[in-house]
């Protein structure tokens, strides 16, 4: 029946952590789409995915026009959007990152050469606040596409696995992730022999990883991460089987989707005879721009030589030439273990690292790897400047923000600049995840941190270059990182020889190697463990054993890069004089109202008097930020006087306010309810030692004056002396004499 609803179910057994049920449904919602499926997680979280395709191919395109969109509906979590118009606007960062998670295993699963427009829209319709919807959306997108009658080699399954108390747990909740050492999203497909080929990995250590490892948990080393990939396989099999069961009941037959005609053997042979020597020579040029210029010349030469014979078949010549540089480079790597720029498969390009690359900023660093150049810049501010989030996630604020910019100048081109594209958001998020596990806690370093990575030159893995530049920039800004982090991009070349697929892993890939290679595998970490990992592949899948070997190869490269970075900076520098100074004070919760005062009068007065900025948390923690240390300390002293009153001591210096003048001196308010007398004989010091007839000639009511408590009599009366710049040493000598 056309309107019949079909179901399939996958039960995930997590042992002591219980079970998760992923249920697929089709035939009830979005019935006019080519394929639609609803995925439920424990009947509590619901994602609707719909796949549609254009009727005719876009023959003028030289790429596959696949679009993935994720629509977060705030009603899913029982919220009303916080925007002015109270409706959803541009996609959140979470939605954009989920789009990329869906796209990465989906794209290589389509028939090669397909030019029909394909759109997949995943709508988050219901969400348990303790669930993460991204992996549910990955499976929903696979299921809806499998049902759509498209040339698609699915299904594939996506699962999040987290290492919690020594066990890999599938589909963990936010609550469970608080105890996780490592968190990993893995997508893969089941092969004919029953094994699972990995198609996509997105992984990270957590904020608590360092502490958990100190407490005895197993560190997420390369071997542990490889074990996590193996642990994900049984879960992926269960998910793929459920989708296959659903497709057996409801999938449309695969339609006719013609692809551009492949090049004839005659064209390939003619092209080989015409320019093979020139092409081979061009592919040995190390410099990116010189190599690309020579490849353009060879392409023009090929057209010039072949057009008389293939008149009117310019597109065919162009199509024949397009894969040649890639296939020739790959063939050289497989046979000779030599790469475009002459390096061996494990060699790293020349590295350079320096800090304090630009003036006045709070922290900066420049990292170069070959032609890839990244500038990292750190800015520190009060915690009230942390990013406020209005999303479906239970996380509402983010004190560490990592922004990645990729202007067209980085590749020597013209182009649009402005708001970040999906790629820039994704690269920034990857670099952020690599750094977060080693950041200090709010209590250890009460600052909002904005890290900006400027890609000033690009020829391979600017995202991993951003990790390296950010580590050095943060250290230069004085951020006490738990450990330095570096990153490296790995590539993979595969070729079938005598029916067997051979793989060669490449360390530190170039942009061209990323383009013609079969895998982009980015790994970041400390000397001890992996902090972030990302895998993209153009193949239907990669054996887990190949990935495990690439992980070990990446570790050797990472350690070498860390050594170079540590030569530039290995410990946190002193904070820049341009950075704000932030200190904390803890007060009783019942004293918060007194510090704020009626209509915020008290807190506003403290901020006005000292120039400090004050943020008060609900638990009584107060963050005080100022341009310099003395201003912050003055604010802290005032707050302590209100909420944590202590008896003043002789020798204590306080910035006070004149509250009354008399013929014999001025009364200065030091703390709420505590005044002291600055005698007229002492006021003359403020007038350069001249005789003072009227106190008002030197001090007025409301004027600020730095004073020191000189004496406290038996009745608690305070006698003050002024603190004069240049005379502080003399004051210290008097204090020593008095003590003797």
Swiss-Prot record:
Subcellular location, principal: cytoplasm
Gene Ontology MF terms in the entry: 3'-5'-RNA exonuclease activity; magnesium ion binding; polyribonucleotide nucleotidyltransferase activity; RNA binding
Binding positions for Mg(2+) per the UniProt entry: 514, 520
Cofactor(s) recorded in Swiss-Prot or TrEMBL: Mg(2+)
Subcellular location: Cytoplasm
KW Membrane (keyword) present: no
Keyword vocabulary terms for this entry: Cytoplasm, Magnesium, Metal-binding, Nucleotidyltransferase, RNA-binding, Transferase
Aminoacyl-tRNA synthetase is among the record's keywords: no
Domain S1 motif: 651-723
Family annotation (Pfam families): KH_1, PNPase, RNase_PH, S1
EC number(s) reported in the record: 2.7.7.8
Protein name (record): Polyribonucleotide nucleotidyltransferase
Organism whose genome encodes this protein: Streptomyces antibioticus
């Amino acid at each position: 029946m056309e309107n019949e609803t079909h179901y399939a179910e996958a039960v995930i057994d997590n042992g002591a952590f219980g079970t998760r049920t992923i249920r697929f449904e089709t035939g009830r919602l979005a019935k006019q789409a080519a394929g639609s499926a609803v995925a439920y997680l424990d009947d509590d979280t619901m994602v609707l995915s719909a796949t549609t395709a254009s009727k005719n191919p876009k023959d003028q395109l030289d790429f596959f026009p696949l679009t993935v969109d994720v629509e977060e509906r705030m009603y899913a979590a029982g919220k009303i959007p916080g925007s002015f118009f109270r409706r959803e606007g541009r996609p959140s960062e979470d939605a954009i990152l989920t789009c990329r998670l869906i796209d990465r295993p989906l794209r290589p699963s389509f028939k090669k050469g397909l030019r029909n427009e394909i759109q997949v829209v995943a709508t988050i319709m219901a969400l348990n606040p303790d669930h993460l919807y991204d992996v549910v959306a990955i499976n929903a997108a696979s299921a809806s596409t499998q049902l759509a009658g498209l040339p698609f080699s699915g299904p594939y399954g996506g699962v999040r696995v987290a290492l919690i108390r020594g066990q890999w747990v599938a589909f963990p909740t936010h609550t469970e992730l608080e105890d996780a050492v490592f968190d990993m999203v893995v997508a893969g497909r089941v092969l004919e022999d029953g094994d699972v080929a990995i198609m996509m990995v997105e992984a990270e250590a957590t904020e608590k990883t360092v502490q958990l490892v100190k407490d005895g948990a197993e560190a997420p080393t390369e071997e542990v991460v490889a074990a996590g990939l193996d642990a994900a396989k049984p879960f992926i099999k269960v998910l793929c089987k459920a989708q296959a069961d659903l497709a057996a009941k409801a999938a449309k037959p695969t339609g006719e989707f013609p692809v551009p005609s492949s090049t004839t053997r005659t064209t390939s042979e003619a092209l080989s005879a015409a320019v093979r020597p020139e092409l081979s020579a061009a592919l040995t040029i190390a410099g990116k721009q010189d190599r690309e210029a020579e490849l353009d010349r060879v392409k023009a030469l090929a057209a010039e030589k072949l057009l008389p014979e293939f008149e009117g078949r310019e597109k065919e010549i162009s199509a024949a030439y397009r894969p040649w540089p890639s296939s020739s480079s790959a063939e050289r790597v497989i046979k000779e273990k030599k790469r475009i720029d002459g390096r061996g498969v494990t060699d790293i390009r020349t590295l350079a690292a320096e800090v304090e690359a630009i003036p006045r900023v709070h922290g900066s660093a420049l990292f170069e790897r070959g032609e890839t150049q990244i500038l990292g810049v750190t800015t520190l501010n009060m915690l009230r400047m942390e990013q406020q989030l209005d999303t479906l996630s239970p996380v509402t604020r983010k004190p560490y923000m990592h922004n990645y910019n990729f202007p067209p100048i980085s590749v020597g081109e013209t182009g649009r600049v402005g708001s970040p594209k999906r790629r820039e958001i994704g690269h920034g998020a990857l670099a952020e995840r690599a750094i977060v596990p080693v950041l200090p806690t709010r209590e250890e370093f009460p600052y909002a941190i904005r890290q900006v990575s400027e890609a000033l030159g690009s020829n391979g893995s600017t995202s991993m270059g951003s990790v390296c530049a950010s580590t050095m920039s943060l250290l230069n800004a004085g951020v006490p990182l738990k450990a330095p982090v570096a990153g490296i991009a790995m590539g993979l070349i595969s070729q079938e020889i005598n029916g067997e697929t051979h793989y060669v892993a490449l360390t530190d890939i170039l942009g061209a190697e990323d383009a013609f290679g079969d895998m982009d595998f980015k790994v970041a970490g400390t000397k001890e463990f992996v902090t972030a990992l990302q895998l993209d592949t153009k193949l239907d899948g990669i054996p887990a054993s190949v990935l495990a070997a690439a992980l070990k190869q990446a570790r050797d490269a990472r350690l070498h890069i860390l050594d170079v970075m540590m030569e530039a900076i290995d410990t946190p520098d002193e904070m820049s004089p341009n950075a704000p100074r932030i200190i904390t004070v803890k007060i009783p919760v019942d004293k918060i109202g007194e510090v704020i005062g009626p209509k915020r009068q008290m807190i506003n007065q403290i901020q006005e008097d000292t120039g400090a900025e004050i943020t008060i948390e609900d638990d009584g923690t107060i963050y005080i930020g100022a341009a310099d240390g003395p201003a912050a300390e003055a604010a802290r002293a005032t707050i302590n006087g209100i909420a944590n009153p202590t008896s003043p001591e002789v020798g204590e210096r306080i910035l006070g306010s004149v509250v009354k003048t008399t013929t014999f001196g001025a009364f200065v308010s030091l703390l709420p309810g505590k005044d002291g007398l600055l005698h007229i004989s002492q006021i003359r010091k403020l007038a350069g030692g001249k005789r003072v007839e009227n106190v008002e000639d030197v001090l007025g009511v409301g004027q600020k004056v730095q004073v020191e408590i000189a004496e406290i009599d038996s009745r608690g009366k305070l006698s003050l002396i002024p603190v004069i710049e240049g005379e502080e040493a003399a004051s210290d000598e008097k204090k020593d004499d008095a003590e003797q």
